Amino acid sequence: MRIEQELKLGFKDVLFRPKRSTLKSRSQVNLTREFTFKHSGRQWSGVPVIAANMDSVGSFEMAKALSQHGVMTAIHKHYTVQDWADFVKDADSETLNKVMVSTGTSEADFQKTKDVMALSDELIFICIDIANGYSEHLVQYVQQVRAAFPDKVISAGNVVTGDMVEELILAGADIVKVGIGPGSVCTTRVKTGVGYPQLSAIIECADAAHGLGGRIIGDGGCACAGDVAKAFGGGADFVMLGGMLAGHEESGGEIVLKDGESYMKFYGMSSKSAMDKHSGGVAGYRAAEGKTVLLPYRGSVHGTIQDILGGVRSTCTYVGAAELRELTKRTTFIRVLEQENNVFGKEK
């Protein structure tokens, strides 16, 4: 047993220090990033925000909506191959280039991924997604997928430390997904005692990934636009959002009527709700590691994504970053004990 004494930080523990800026307007800020990925050699351009691959967020409808803003969607893995075929038939190139095909690590998952990727050459992202990215099996699976898809962009996770980021990149991942337990409907940290404060995880994992020419996704923990900006400031190349994009018309969640009001069900992908729906219930050897909540129905996602991107643009103007890629270089975080004045309640 050992204890690491260094303090680890989450988004609530810091604020940006403002810096001199020559920008006159938020409209001058360019949020588009261009990446060339290490293993696939693929070039990609877009706004590096990703809707999470949860079945009450990462829907085909969400992908169509967010692609209009240059934003990505990781499609949840519970659609059938026929569902994908119907989607590909109707989707334009811009949408197809902004989606990730999510998969688990079983042989059935591998075959399904091959079937889906064969539907269109314009599907270029594969997201290998398991809760515990420290499994040796994940490394072997990344190698298997890389061998089968040498020209596709592969994301793998989730992990929170630089050593495993390096191992996954060396195994063939272009992008590593970072985050264990920070999500709004995740209870892994409570059920297992395992986790890592998300901002520190991003800072440390970005350093490891960039040293090898890889990229990271900061996955989870964002509760507001300022948190998204902090993730980018900490070095995340992409930021994945679940709860912030849940509850919308395009989210794909179940709508529930309660006391005359409309709500949408939102749950973690290791929750009892998810396992009841997709696995026939919680297996006898495990515990559910997620919660189920009802969110007030929020209408179209377009207003929400505009608000998030507007907040990030504003961050850039405060620190003098004309482009999103400059934000991490312009970032100085200050440690704080407060974030906002809640005398009239929190912002909705």
Curated annotation (Swiss-Prot):
SMART domains: IMPDH. PROSITE patterns: IMP_DH_GMP_RED. One of its GO terms (biological process) is purine nucleotide metabolic process. Its EC number is 1.7.1.7. The active site is at residue 186. K(+) binds at residues 181, 183. It holds the Pfam family IMPDH. NADP(+) binds at residues 108-131, 216-239. One of its GO terms (molecular function) is metal ion binding. Keywords: Metal-binding, NADP, Oxidoreductase, Potassium. HAMAP family: GMP_reduct_type1 (MF_00596). Belongs to the IMPDH/GMPR family. GuaC type 1 subfamily. Catalyzes the irreversible NADPH-dependent deamination of GMP to IMP. It functions in the conversion of nucleobase, nucleoside and nucleotide derivatives of G to A nucleotides, and in maintaining the intracellular balance of A and G nucleotides. This is GMP reductase. The lineage of its organism: Bacteria, Pseudomonadati, Pseudomonadota, Gammaproteobacteria, Vibrionales.
